[in-house]
């Protein structure tokens, strides 16, 4: 997402920024009298301003948005109303639904078939490599147990679809790397990777709390992905039949798509313990189903969701920033940073192994390795769970999760933004 400010507006831009902080200085007023609408105004206005500023500085706009969340959040100025913070998780999920639906609407099954074996391996092998790297490095570096290292590894191993998917969609639009299905390969892997990592995380937590590392829980991973794909494709087919039979505006179709996605998320909560089912995979698969059965509509809906993403991106990354307690990042020290970078090297090695024997040349492999590094959404969602459960490694896990967001999200995004024209061929 890029913004441009002409020279004539620079003074106004500076005045707006200054005025905001002057206004925020009387924060007691906002904390006592503010409400959800005031908080949303702050989120979108300051998110736009800092996103624009960072774009001008040749840095990813999402970094400005994350910093916006840190500034507005409960650990700095505390200007966000509690009603916003209490539904932050749901709002972040809404943004994920929008971007994953866009991903599905652009993901041709034939392109994934072309990618073949690497597309399958990218769903789990890089994450396994990163967790293994953390298990090997963390006990010696930080003096923790192997199981605690596995918990930390599973927190930081998930790649962020919210960072990766929009960039891959841009590559598809510009026809960069599409001849070898590189954007589709990365996009599909980034979406499934999260499901795999979260199941491992919950398994490690149960084991740490005195339970057993159940093989059945590990079987849940492929089952939940397969069930999610089947449910999504069926839902996509039914929606196509509905849209062909009843004439309605595309905007109404977008609303229906969002409602179906929300119902799938609720369904996962209700039956997830008994029937392995990934709602986010299903959401993406709905888009895939629509593209397969009604490609003209898929392109029109993709344009609609692209416009929704303008606001959703700001909301998502500002709220991710609001979860970041900066004191944990400051306290993390050099050792935590070394662990994150070391684990990333293992992750990139995992990506390299996935691509062995593929048609990708050296430049394309380097690009894929870099594109698979950003962390944000999953770390914000699960980083604090071990601390809330009272685990000995809880504070350290949260610290490393926070630091991984601050380091990898902007670096990974910048690596993609400023290398793709050099590393990928335009078809």
Where are these regions (language model features)?
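Transmembrane helical cores of multi-pass secondary ion antiporters/exchangers
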Residues: 8, 12-15, 22-25, 29-427
């Amino acid at each position: 997402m890029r913004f441009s400010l002409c020279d004539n507006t620079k003074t106004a831009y500076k005045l707006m920024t200054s005025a905001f902080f002057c206004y925020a200085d009387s924060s007691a007023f906002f904390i006592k009298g503010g409400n959800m609408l005031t908080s949303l105004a702050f989120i979108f206005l300051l998110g736009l301003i800092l996103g624009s500023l960072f774009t001008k500085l040749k840095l990813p706009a999402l970094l400005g948005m994350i910093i916006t969340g840190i500034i507005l959040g409960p650990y700095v100025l505390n200007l966000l109303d509690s009603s916003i913070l209490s539904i932050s998780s749901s709002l972040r999920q809404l943004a994920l639904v929008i971007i994953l639906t866009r991903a599905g609407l652009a993901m041709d099954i034939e392109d994934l078939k072309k990618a073949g074996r690497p597309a399958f391996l990218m769903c789990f092998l890089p994450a396994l490599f990163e967790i293994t790297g953390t298990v090997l490095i963390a006990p010696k570096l930080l003096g923790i147990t192997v199981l605690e290292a596995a918990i930390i590894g599973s927190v930081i191993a998930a790649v962020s679809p919210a960072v990766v998917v929009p960039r891959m969609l841009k590559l598809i639009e510009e026809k960069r790397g599409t001849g070898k299905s590189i954007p589709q390969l990365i996009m599909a892997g980034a979406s499934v990777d999260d499901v795999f990592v979260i199941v491992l995380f919950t398994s490690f937590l149960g084991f740490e709390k005195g339970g057993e590392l159940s093989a059945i829980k590990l079987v849940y991973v492929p089952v939940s992905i397969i069930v999610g794909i089947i449910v999504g494709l069926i839902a996509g087919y039914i929606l196509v039949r509905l849209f062909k039979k009843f004439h309605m505006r595309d905007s109404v179709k977008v609303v229906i798509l969002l409602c179906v996605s929300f119902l799938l998320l609720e369904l996962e909560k209700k039956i997830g313990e008994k029937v392995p089912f990934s709602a986010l995979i299903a959401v993406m698969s709905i888009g895939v189903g629509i593209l397969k059965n009604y490609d003209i509509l898929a392109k029109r809906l993709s344009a609609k969701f692209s416009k929704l993403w303008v606001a959703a991106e700001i909301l998502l990354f500002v709220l991710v920033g609001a979860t970041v307690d900066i004191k944990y990042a400051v306290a993390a020290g050099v050792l935590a940073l070394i662990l994150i970078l070391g684990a990333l090297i293992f992750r990139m090695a995992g990506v390299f192994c996935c691509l062995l024997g593929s048609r990708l040349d050296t430049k394309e492999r380097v690009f894929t390795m870099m594109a698979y590094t950003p962390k944000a959404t999953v770390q914000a969602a699960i980083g604090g769970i071990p601390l809330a459960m009272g685990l000995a490694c809880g504070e350290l896990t949260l610290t490393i999760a926070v630091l991984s967001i601050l380091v990898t999200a902007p670096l990974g995004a910048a690596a993609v933004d400023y290398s793709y024209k050099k590393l990928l061929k335009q078809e």
